[in-house]
Amino acid sequence: MSKEITGALFKQMILHGAAAITAQKQAINDLNVFPVPDGDTGTNMSMTIATAAEALRKAAPSSVGQASSVTASALLQGARGNSGVILSLLFRGLSKALKGMETADAAAFAAAMQEGVAAAYKAVMKPAEGTVLTVSRLAAKRAVDTAAEGADVETTLAAAIEEGYDALAQTTDMNPVLKKAGVVDAGGKTPNAPEAVLEAAIAEGQLALEPTTEMNPVLKKAGVVDAGGKGYLLILEGMLAELRGEPIPENEEEPETHKEKADFNAMAQEEITFTFDTVYVVRKAREDIDLMPLRAYLSSIGDSLVIGEDDETFKVHVHTNTPGAALTESQKYGTLELAKIENMR
């Protein structure tokens, strides 16, 4: 077992994580009913992490801090949809915690996972439990607890993933949309060595995943677990597979083998309050610019608001009926670089 995560190992872990969710993206799409029933969480998360994988293939990170920084920057720039932006935030917080480190042992990696969760909760304007936020939070806590007991990274991550799946199962009753659809959340599946941390995180994540159905009223209504939570756990499982020397998944499973699938026909379009899924990137006018006034404005004209940022740019995801107003207001904080607007009806 690996005692510590190096830059080269972290790179391979991300490549494995990207392959794992790509192989199951349609299964994740089939669970996606929250925050809106558009069936694209698997696609968005897989394409988001694919940008990090591409960036890492071109890099030769000399440390875990550098590898995680490349990953976080690429994820922010390539984030698609609500689930992609939240995924980028989980790794942004992790990257900040690993900054300057040559290698990371179980305790350091577990603590970094927890920092990622804190970053995600802080960036989401109205955090909803029974989602990837719940799954990642409980998984990270399990990772920290397991690492504190002296477990290696593999064992720690596996335990966290197990806990995450347990929480995911409860997302259906926690979220009414998932309960109605009958699925879980799509976005959220040697002492101090990395393997133990990942084992614990995966174990905890698995435990956390199941309850997401009960925790989120939307998921409960749909009868599914959280798609984002499931997707996150798949990425962690791929990372753990690299630590264990297991192969990267190559083929996506056939649709008929899916055990869970949301009934999208049962999810009426009137549940979509805001029509346009709006995602855009703004280059900051200055590094220390205060985005709180912008957060307040955007939350007043839409929902599902998430803002991720690094030193030079910020990325906004919001559902709104007035995307033009969102873009105009945001340009007070810098220069618009990229925008994508989709009609969700």
Q: Where are the predicted features?
A:
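N-terminal loops that bind phosphate or other acidic moieties
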Residues: 1-345
